[in-house]
Amino acid sequence: FNELAASGLALRTHGGIRFLEQEVPSVPYGLREEWNIEEKKAIAQEAVKYIRDSHSVMIYGGSTTGHLGFYLTQGRIITNLPDLCRILRMRFPTGDGPQVILTGGEFDFRTGNLEGPALRRSLENYECDVGVASAYGVDETGLIDISDECSEQIALMLGKSSLRIILADHSKFKRKGFCRSLPWNRIH
């Protein structure tokens, strides 16, 4: 409760909290990474089954995609999630794990991602075997996210990948969002 109130997402009340009215709340990464953690780990572990050691992988930062760092062992990774680098550094302190390229961009403290024009420029020269992303929500038409910026970056990273994998825990389904990212017919 205290963390939600401190982040500006909720107001403490007697006996609990009341969420503040926002069109689409951007919950800080530090909170999101703890929610549904066992489910997120299981989803990431399942996703890794589609990624070969020889693959290059583009990973859009998110609280679920970050868990891939606990399961990837080889290959080349391009990501906008600095926390993924932290996880891999802990797992491979001598540097014998995957090669990692961290995109450029401005660090967004709420999302935990690098974002903006520098990210887009840094991706211009790359294409990957596999693209992995999560989103604010998914519905019958496709992916939904919290901003044009996030939606555009997800579309860019997945668009530069041959195989596209979406990671979504149960809380993402039929969630109302703000921006359409990618329709299902562009994710295959």
Where are these regions (language model features)?
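HTH-adjacent hinge/linker in prokaryotic transcriptional regulators
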Residues: 2-60, 71, 93-96
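Conserved phosphate- and dinucleotide-binding cores of soluble alpha/beta proteins
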Residues: 5-6, 12, 83-188
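Electropositive phosphate-/nucleotide-binding environments in soluble metabolic enzymes
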Residues: 7, 34-41, 45, 62, ...
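Alpha-helical segments flanking ligand/cofactor-binding loops in enzyme cores
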Residues: 45-48, 66, 70, 121, ...
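Short conserved AdoMet
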Residues: 52, 73, 159-162
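Amphipathic alpha-helical effector-binding/dimerization core
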Residues: 56, 61-88, 92-94, 98-99
